[in-house]
């Protein structure tokens, strides 16, 4: 039988999602906990592999097990075997053809900036800190050039392995909530470092070091070296993954929950 789980995790505690030798990864911890409950080796497939330091409030995974278990075994049981910083939010049986990765139609990320003079003590690992004042309104104006289907070569990592630089951004907003600036972006898929590279350039616009139309110009130039530095990983969250309705994948509240949406 095939199961799907929704996970949340604090990426600052782990060296990214993907299993690696000699360092702690989210995938390794999840597979070890699931294997204890299944009483058999379990391998998982995730909706999107996050880098070291990147968080998730709604990472979706699927896995196959030979023997059924009650849903509570995959929630409370797995949580009791997971280390601090990783938790299951829900579990359910899914169709055998469901894929957490390939069945997804869109993914949504949030990037959170603490725009304060001094770095925060609480939530410091869950935000990026920029002490210089940022203008969220001009960042929002600039960001609209990225909505739609484009060649995002200017915003992909040099070692990105995707066969195509084209992605379709369905929504991109920048807003200020008190001391926080939230960049919220949805797309059919993302290139490696795409969100953090976009945010890095939006920060430059927010500092009034470049005009809003600079973002569109970067897109047209298709040159990563012309754009700004990659934003830090600590402010990035995978907050939602969308699937066709017939899979009946539950919606989770958008996170991180301390934002209070």
Curated annotation (Swiss-Prot):
Keywords, comma-separated and alphabetical? Isomerase, tRNA processing
> What processes in GO biological process is this protein linked to?
tRNA pseudouridine synthesis
This protein's superkingdom? Answer: Bacteria
Residues in a coiled coil are none
What are the binding positions for substrate in this chain? 109
Q: Which Pfam family name is an example for this entry? A: PseudoU_synth_1
What this chain does, per the record? Formation of pseudouridine at positions 38, 39 and 40 in the anticodon stem and loop of transfer RNAs.
**Family according to the record:** Belongs to the tRNA pseudouridine synthase TruA family.
Which NCBIfam families does this entry report, sorted A to Z? hisT_truA
UniProt-recorded name of the protein: tRNA pseudouridine synthase A
- Report the source organism: Idiomarina loihiensis (strain ATCC BAA-735 / DSM 15497 / L2-TR)
């Amino acid at each position: 039988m095939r199961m799907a789980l929704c996970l949340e995790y604090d990426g600052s505690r782990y060296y990214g999602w993907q299993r690696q030798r000699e360092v702690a990864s989210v995938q390794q911890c999840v597979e070890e906990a699931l294997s204890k409950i299944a009483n058999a080796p379990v391998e998982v497939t995730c909706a999107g592999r996050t880098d070291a330091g990147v968080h998730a409030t709604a990472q979706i995974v699927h896995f196959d097990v030979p023997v059924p278990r009650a849903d509570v075994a995959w929630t409370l049981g797995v949580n009791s075997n997971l280390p601090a910083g990783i938790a299951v939010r829900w579990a359910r049986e899914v169709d055998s053809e469901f894929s957490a990765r390939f069945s997804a139609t869109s993914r949504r990320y949030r990037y959170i900036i603490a725009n304060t003079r001094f770095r925060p003590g609480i939530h410091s690992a869950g935000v990026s800190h920029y002490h210089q004042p940022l203008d969220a309104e001009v960042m929002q104006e600039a960001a609209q050039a990225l909505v739609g289907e484009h060649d995002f070569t200017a915003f992909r990592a040099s070692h990105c392995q995707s066969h195509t630089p084209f992605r379709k951004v369905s929504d991109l907003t920048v807003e200020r909530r008190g001391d926080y600036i939230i960049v919220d972006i949805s797309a059919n898929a993302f290139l490696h470092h795409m969100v953090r590279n976009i945010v890095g350039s939006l920060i430059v616009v927010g500092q009034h070091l470049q005009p809003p139309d600079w973002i569109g110009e970067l897109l047209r130039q298709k040159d990563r070296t012309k754009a700004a530095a990659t934003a830090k990983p600590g402010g990035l969250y995978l907050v939602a993954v969308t699937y066709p309705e017939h899979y009946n994948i539950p919606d989770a509240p958008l996170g991180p929950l301390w934002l209070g949406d």
